[in-house]
Amino acid sequence: WELQPGAKPPYGNWSVETREEFAHAATARMGCVRQACETGKYNAAILLGGGEPGFLESREIGREFGVVVTANAFSQMYLATMLGDSFSIIDIEGVHNVFYRDLIRTHQLQHRCRSIRSIGYSLPRPGDTDPDTLTVQCEAVAKGDQNIVVERAVDQAEAAIVEDGAEVITLGCSMTFFLQPHIEKGLRDRGWDVPVLEGYTASIELAK
């Protein structure tokens, strides 16, 4: 495996969230995919990022070279359908939920998705002044500190099971992927033996 650093985003140095930013990211990464395929060194390419900008286009490029292309949302959803009859998504708040809803429809899995639930945090944006960001919460979790985002994520995952009928939990934005082991443990502690997926591992496994 090799990690390609990707192209510098033309809109600025922050995470994609709006449709315009997703379009810029899609265009930039298609060039990276074609370049990787043309080397002849790889038999698979994995697109990182929960919103998977440019996935369908990159998959089309990959077919020209016999290279498998996987992405985080697609991989989680289809593995989820192998593990249960239905799944729910734990995501950040805001417009990303709407974009992710459209991904579910694109992949024709709206009949298997029970809900998209929010943890109440959005991605850091230019001009944000709130000191309590998802990045801060992620760093706190890494240090082993007790924090609200893990509790919220476990609560939403349990609600997806109890109220929505989900049999598998998946994660939306890649900024939430760090929550996977904490959600899995939190659900187990509450008596739920339910698979919890995250995009990076799912994409690698599907590529294999």
Language-model segment annotations:
Residues P5-A7, E93-H96, S118-L123, C173-F177, ...:
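Glycine-rich beta-alpha junction loops
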Residues E2-T27, G127:
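N-terminal beta-loop-helix "entrance" segment that forms/cooperates
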Residues S88-D91:
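Structural beta-sheet core signal
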Residues E151-V196, Y200:
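Glycine/small-residue-rich hydrophobic helix-like segments
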Residues V16-A36, N147-Q156:
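Glycine-rich, highly charged phosphate/nucleotide-binding loops
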Residues E93, R101-G172:
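Active-site rim beta-loop-alpha module in soluble metabolic enzymes
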Residues L56-L83, I183-A207:
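Short, acidic/small-residue loops that bind anionic groups at enzyme active sites
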Residues A23-G62, V69-A73, E167-Q180:
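N-terminal glycine-rich phosphate/adenylate-binding segment common to multiple enzyme folds
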